[in-house]
């Protein structure tokens, strides 16, 4: 009996160790020599594809700095693999270990914090409305009876419905499978408006065939922290990520990176997003934190 109990105890310890290892991304990377970065194909200047399996963007580059610091910590180069994620599957893929660090356009909110952890915020977004310039739409009230596009798995339409100015406004929701698809709904006339993060709207407009045909209008629906996502219960990786972004802010590298991606011409069309750092983003740099969107709403 004692031997049986001892065997069970050993198995329990082994299982606990395996669980800890699964959530220790740095140890996992050291053992395997591989780290998998979750990427997006059309998340505005934060993260997008260049084609041929290549990705780039503001959050993509921040993640590259974090990965470089993992390599320094473990003393060897890593094979960085890229996993394309969507708004629907990004959280499950981080949870199940397919993706080690997700570098896209994910809102840090209280619900998601139950499932994943976020690196301290370095980009704060304003959710806005994009329309065709000749639509005559300038406010939420004018969306009554209209079709409004958003991307499956995002929170934007819920924010629109919760806005006090939307009381009594009845609109139809249409969904794109990704942000580019949602913008296409607007561009093709299948939607009268596209509700999404301002930089995603601005980025899609800047690369449209005729950017002047579109504009961003109306009230700011919400202010949301957009952050890099990792697995829960991984304090070593959380600290390394937070330390990395803190060093980038302190050195001025973060501000330079922001200017590069939001104020200068960027690939693939050499177009400029033209979105200066908001006061909320500057405040996040001045006081780095991982507070959820709900805390921003209280202000």
Language-model-derived ranges and their functions:
Residues 89, 104-114, 159-166, 185-188, ...:
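A ligand-binding cleft/hinge motif common to bilobed small-molecule-binding domains
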Residues 36-45, 55-72, 107, 124-179, ...:
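Bilobed "Venus flytrap"/periplasmic-binding protein-like clamshell domains
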Residues 75-142, 283-291:
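Acidic, polar ligand-binding/catalytic clefts
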Residues 22-102:
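Extracytoplasmic small-molecule ligand-binding "clamshell" domains
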Residues 158-174, 212-214, 246-299:
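Ligand-binding clefts/hinges and TM-proximal coupling segments of bilobed small-molecule sensing domains
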Residues 61-69, 141, 146-147, 152-154, ...:
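Extended ligand-binding regions for polar small-molecule ligands
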Residues 41, 123-131, 206-245, 264-287:
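Periplasmic-binding protein-like
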Residues 74-86, 169-178, 218:
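Short beta-strand-to-loop elements that line the ligand-binding cleft
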